[in-house]
A protein has these predicted regions:
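Short, glycine/charge-rich beta-strand/loop segments that flank catalytic centers
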Residues: 2-19
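Helix-start/capping segments and mature chain N-termini
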Residues: 13, 20-231
């Protein structure tokens, strides 16, 4: 049965498994794949806090990789944000805490007027596959997309001028997830839902390609045939 909010999550991973304990690279690694049925990642409204003190990843590090160590630095500040009622945090750059980078599980998208803006990739931002897919889908649907730095101040200014239309996140698990509010310090920015939002339009197209109801002209999907074990 096709269900747009349910899927099988597939996660390949690799870990050091050498028979030694020392502060050095291992000479042996184990590769595994785990799967899990999943449903909507965030079941309720997403309200985020812009983090301007703690840092997820710094320039020159490995923030652009899917490394487990990158999550460790995010746990404590995220726990503090959760205790205040926030769903997630939006990380800012490690130097000035001025430019937004990503959220805990998502790449971030800002719609100002009719332009979609997503932070340009650097060595502290993980470049997600869903992010790449949405850039392609948005541009093919005539939506202007900019990959560039975007500051917290620019978002606040757009909100004050009434031209901040949407904020949403993208990721393998979340797909496309609208963000309902952003808090910067003591200022809360509430984003009104759009009837024909870019987020809902792009999510519908992406999920249609994933479940086969929309033809995949990009070669993003592969058919997996049933395998019957002989044992």
């Amino acid at each position: 049965k096709k269900d747009e909010e349910h899927s099988l999550y597939i996660r390949p991973f690799i870990f050091a498994s050498g028979e030694c304990i020392k502060a050095s690279a291992s000479d042996e690694y184990t590769f595994m794949i785990i799967t899990s049925p999943t449903t909507r990642y965030y079941p309720s409204d997403i309200n985020v806090l812009v983090e301007q003190h703690y840092t997820r990843a710094a320039k020159g590090g490995v923030g652009y990789t899917k490394a487990s160590g990158n999550y460790a630095s995010s746990f404590y500040p995220t726990k503090l944000a959760n205790a205040r009622g926030f769903t997630q945090v939006i990380w800012t750059d490690a130097v000035e805490h001025k430019y937004i980078e990503e959220s805990g599980t998502m790449n971030i998208w800002i719609r100002i007027n009719d332009t979609l803006i997503t932070p340009e990739l650097n060595d502290s931002i993980l470049g997600g596959f869903t992010r790449d897919s949405l850039i392609t889908l948005a541009r093919e649907n005539g939506i202007k997309v900019e990959e560039r730095k975007i500051s917290v101040d620019e978002i606040i200014e757009a909100y004050n001028n009434g031209i901040l239309k949407e904020v949403f996140g993208t990721g393998t698990a979340v797909t496309v997830a609208p963000i309902h509010s952003i808090t910067v310090g003591d200022k809360k920015i509430e984003i009104e839902s759009q009837i024909n939002s870019y987020a809902s339009k792009l999510k519908k197209t992406l999920q249609g390609i994933q479940n086969g109801s929309i033809k995949d002209v990009y070669g993003w999907t592969s058919k997996v045939n049933s395998v019957v074990s002989s044992h």
